[in-house]
Amino acid sequence: MDQFELPEALFRIGLIENLELRIEVPNYTTVDTPGDNVDGFSDGSIGVKVHLADQNGALPDLGLIASASLPVGKEAFSSDNVDPTLTLAWAYDLDSGYSIGGNVGVTSSDGGGDDRFLETAYSFAAGIPLTESWSAYVEYYGLSFLSSDEDSEHYMNGGFTYLVNNNLQLDWRIGFGLTDNSDDLFTGAGLSVRF
């Protein structure tokens, strides 16, 4: 199976100090399998992120993200319901520009079926400075389905970021699945712009 998604766009808009609005644009997705091709838009989402605490001693920088999917996608790529998500994100700056971070979140979803289940997502990443403009990262993340028969999915990925200027960053990533039901290989490129 081959899958392609575009644009993977997330708009982050500062509302007031320590509060941002987050709007995820639906992706146009194509899935090619032997004998069948499906394409169309996925669901989008809307949410907010609240900054809870700055890094202080052993305490990391903390943020809480509350969001909900918007069921606007094609049937093959939509749950046809509003699926709420709550995520705790953390980051910790180490010496010499190194950093670690991660998140843990839970989503209530029906996966397009009749019964709702809880899906947890979790990640841990390390950031590595290479030059003033170039950085690298490596990340582990996973998905577990608490009240569903689906098996957990686990992934590793890494990539590079290039800071063109203070308002523009380019990135590239590549990763692979660690479990049988995970995607074998994936890659992507991105562009971050600050207005």
Regions found by a protein language model. Name each.
Residues 1-195:
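Transmembrane beta-barrel domains of Gram-negative outer membranes and organellar outer membranes
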